[in-house]
Amino acid sequence: MMNSNLVPFDPYYKKRITYVWRGQQFAFDVAHTIFSSFQIDEGTDLLLRLIEPAFSEPQRILDVGCGCGVIGICLARRFPQADVTLVDKDLLAVRYARHNAELNATTNVTVLGSVGLSEAPPGPYDLIVSNIPAKIGDYAIEHEFILEPLRHLRPGGEYWFVVVSGLNHLIPRLGPRHNLRLKEIKKRAGHSVYRIIAPAATMPTGGL
């Protein structure tokens, strides 16, 4: 576990980014090769400013593809009663997300290395979030970042995610294709935020 005083000596360390969300100050140390290492990604910021889950006090939250941990750590601060799990396939991202959880005193965060959700604790989760990577291909996005997370939601749970506008050719088609309760929450230059609500009874399985 990295100590905040030692981070500048880490060979991958790039800089510390400050971020204000819901009136609270956060700090995130980032590495050279981690996604969005210059500033908080605009899609991440848009998602965080829009997310309002129906469960006012979610007990279990999952951040898929967490990067350095911005979304999950912010939600852990907002919902201190929740058990928040962050997963990423990049072990350097995992290392920095763990450090940033400590840096921001979010003791309710667990960070795990995981390809997709293979190592994530089993659901159900009340809330799942993701800034979906754009360059992994339509099939992987559909199956690994849309349908698979839905398997881990509790009935009535919510999946909030943001995508770059280049994926708007794909995401809206997935609603009718898999009978999903999919809604576009907001479109802003470069990004769109969506929400899927899991059915009250059976999880979607079409196409798997």
Predicted features and spans:
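Core SAM-dependent methyltransferase catalytic element
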Residues: K187-L208
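A short glycine-rich, Lys/Arg-flanked "PGG" loop and its adjoining helix->strand segment in the class I
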Residues: H143-P155
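Conserved beta-strand signature within the Rossmann-like core of class I S-adenosyl-L-methionine
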Residues: G156-V163
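Conserved class I S-adenosyl-L-methionine
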Residues: V164-H178
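Conserved SAM/SAH cofactor-binding pocket of Class I
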Residues: G43-P121, S130
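Class I SAM-dependent methyltransferase Rossmann-like catalytic core
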Residues: V30-Q39
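Conserved proline-anchored active-site loop of SAM-dependent methyltransferases
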Residues: V64-C68, Y125-G137, P149
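N-terminal auxiliary segments of SAM/dcSAM-dependent transferases
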Residues: M1-W21, S36
